[in-house]
Amino acid sequence: MAHVAEWKKKEVEELTNIIKSYPVIALVDVANVPAYPLSKMREKLRGKALLRVSRNTLIELAIKRAAQELGKPELEKLIDHIQGGAGILATEMNPFKLYKLLEESKTPAPAKPGVPVPRDVVIPAGPTSISPGPLVGEMQALGIPARIEKGKVSIQKDYTVLKAGEVITEQLARILNALGIEPLEVGLNLLAAYEDGIVYTPEVLAIDEEEYINLLQQAYMHAFNLSVNTAYPTSQTIEAIIQKAYLGAKNVAVEAGYITPETVEDIFGRALRAVLLIAQNLPEELLDEKTKELLNQQAQIAVATQPQQEEKVEEAEEEEEEEEASEEDALAGLGALFG
């Protein structure tokens, strides 16, 4: 039986205790993080999370032991995500907040050959501080629209030299460093995070907060409307359900001419409008003074509202003309596309 060094036993024991002591356990890759940025990250995490860097094999043993002692076999799924130079990040912060904190803590870094970029790399249009030389030819060989203007290299338009995930070549590293473009990031890359029996990957944690909030708001409104329309009472919808039922009952009573303190005004108002409609078609000598007065008031109201209605009609016509023009433009564009 091979002898196991005491420091390894102690390390596994300490890692196991850390894993057992926190509700959220994350794996992070610290392989390409220089010592100084790593120390700054430790400072930023102080009071929020505990970072422990160790050997991958020892981390794996600690996860297995903690999973067994806690009776949580799903914790072992974290082992599948150990890679690079792994470290354990133990915290009470939920995985989404932890991921956001780590991403916001990353700082730009210069280009290095052989390293994939985390996102698209774009060389912006405009003048540079680079003097004419062999670098211009290298740029043009890569398709970068560069030329000499006023004794300096100038980029004619924005140009994407790398897509996310593509690897930086030696030639491109020289160009990007000369331009002062830092396409890489220095920081802790979250590999996976465990909480309450679930292992979260970066793809799951990288959410658009505004979009997520909008989706939640839409879901709430759909659920609210469903509850109201099906008359399923909850603490949030009971008031709207009662209001809807009240208005529905009132409308039925008004339509049926059933007089109550709540419907009497609507019923008599409806009856009055019907009477005035009939009176408009009768000879004037058959009408009493009160009816004439009411008809006159109705006519004045109609005259006052007519300009507003005409304006709305004109606006609608203008909108229709604009829509027709845009449709014609679109059809013309399609014709050009297809010859």
Curated annotation (Swiss-Prot):
Subunit record text: Part of the 50S ribosomal subunit. Forms part of the ribosomal stalk which helps the ribosome interact with GTP-bound translation factors. Forms a heptameric L10(L12)2(L12)2(L12)2 complex, where L10 forms an elongated spine to which the L12 dimers bind in a sequential fashion.
UniProt KW keywords: Ribonucleoprotein, Ribosomal protein, RNA-binding, rRNA-binding
Gene: rpl10
Acidic residues composition bias: residue spans: 312-330
Role: Forms part of the ribosomal stalk, playing a central role in the interaction of the ribosome with GTP-bound translation factors.
UniProt record, GO biological process: cytoplasmic translation; ribosomal large subunit assembly
Keyword Ribonucleoprotein applies: yes
Keyword rRNA-binding recorded: yes
Record-linked PANTHER family: 60S ACIDIC RIBOSOMAL PROTEIN P0, LARGE RIBOSOMAL SUBUNIT PROTEIN UL10
The protein's name: Large ribosomal subunit protein uL10
NCBIfam families: PRK04019.1-2 (NF003096), PRK04019.1-5 (NF003098)
Molecular functions (GO terms): large ribosomal subunit rRNA binding; structural constituent of ribosome
